[in-house]
Amino acid sequence: MEHIKNVIERYKHVRNMKMLQQAYQGKYAFVGIGNHSTNNLYPVLNYLHVPLKYICCKTPGKLHLIEGVFPHVRATTSLDEVLTDEDIKGVFVSVSSKAHFSIASRVLAHKKALFIEKPPCLNAEELRRLIELQKQTQVLAMVDLQKRFAPAMQILKKKLQGSKGTKTYNLKFLTGAYPEGDALLDLFIHPIDCVVYLFGKAEVRCVEPIDEHTVMLVLKHADAIGVLELSTDYTWSDAKESMTINTNKGIYSLEQMETLTFQRKPHRFCGLPLEKVLMHVNVTAELFGRNNFQPLMQNNQVF
């Protein structure tokens, strides 16, 4: 028993040292301090211990308030001050969509890594120019389409690579009314990005808008076809995001990016479903799920 305790303590020590050694080599800056940033992005940076040196905003009256909340950060209205600081290795940007292209261009031109809230620009020409600038400077640039990096999505991506034939899927993204912005660019872009990430480039086979709140889509990929319901005609108190994928091996179900399950299909003989003749026991395997009982990193929504 003493030997087992020593092994456990040794493991805990190694794990703790590994975490403490993961230090950042540079400083970072954040442009913008709106509601989305303070509610969603700053908490993640704090959780990851990202060393922010600057917070940049356009309102001088906010500067002393920002430094009161973030005592180790310099608040400024000058983007030039941020971009000319050699300590700054990367910049997070989350401001008005109209200002994204201008700020992103300047960040890339100064060869700083860029993480920018969607959309990074407002038209195809601006997007082309940003892509060219990123290629010229060879710096890391990323748009905030973070759902594709969720653990459940990563697992699902690997599982789908082992399936054969044409896959079919149904996706529902249902929220309440969204009068404060563009639902397509602010909300619906996330599920659309997810299916492109999972199945590759998509061809729009059918688009059916319903009033100004719902879009029904049929998308065709190289080896998959899916139906999407994207709507702001439901409720925020019970907003839903779910996907069901039918493959040759079985059925994958993804709920709220928090639960991923797999149900194997019953066998067939010469096209005949044996479950109609023999007893079939449905077995659902949980491939990913959060356990709120244990306060571990994997069970934290920030993770």
Label each residue range with its predicted role.
Residues F70-I131:
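Beta-loop-alpha module in the N-terminal Rossmann-like domain of NAD(P)-dependent dehydrogenases
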